[in-house]
């Protein structure tokens, strides 16, 4: 166009300034593309039922249970499963009502009930928005693969993590959560057979025996 100088011949400081602006815009564009392509934490389902296998370092045991999870009302119900005959093994049902700050422990055979105060705050089963993306990979063999993403609480100032969560790419179902301390696994839970929704909301209602509940936690073995 008449009267418009080529960029490389703009007199004075205006030329370098325009070049700097173009360079900055180019960098911003590249950053935007990177941000769009970067994985972001998905939103896990708020209400679902399934099964879990939990390993606790303190006991050295794996425990199996049915799980009802209600994130909307901050409550969880865990029902111990018997998968093998273990001498002197008592099976319990646990109802955790975080809004009320209480947990009920009910022995399945006798309905004996203990009522205890929840000391830990509600911690939803999902991926925190400030989590660090670690990896994406498939579980299973050919024709049976499920894509999952691995997230952690690792930060740049710390080279190790204390929490790792694995969730499916599709629908954001929980697959596994692992907690570590001093490089050792202290708690690891695997989730499977997940179905959306709560089939029977009454599972969160303690039985009538809990009206006269004791205040001490019952032992899992026969030494009561």
Curated annotation (Swiss-Prot):
Q: Which UniProt keywords apply?
A: Disulfide bond, Glycoprotein, Lipid-binding, Lysosome, Secreted, Signal
Q: Where in the cell is it found?
A: Lysosome lumen; Secreted
State which residues carry a glycan (glycosylated): 130, 182
Q: Which domain of life is it from?
A: Eukaryota
Q: Which PROSITE patterns match?
A: EPENDYMIN_1 (PS00898), EPENDYMIN_2 (PS00899)
GO cellular component, alphabetical, reads:
extracellular region; lysosomal lumen
Instruction: Name the major location.
Output: other
Q: In the record, which residues are listed under signal peptide?
A: 1-37
Cite the post-translational modification comment.
N-glycosylated; the glycan contains mannose-6-phosphate moieties.
* One of the record's GO molecular function terms: lipid binding
Function statement? Binds anionic lipids and gangliosides at acidic pH.
Indicate what this protein is called per its UniProt record.
Mammalian ependymin-related protein 1
Gene name, Swiss-Prot/TrEMBL: EPDR1
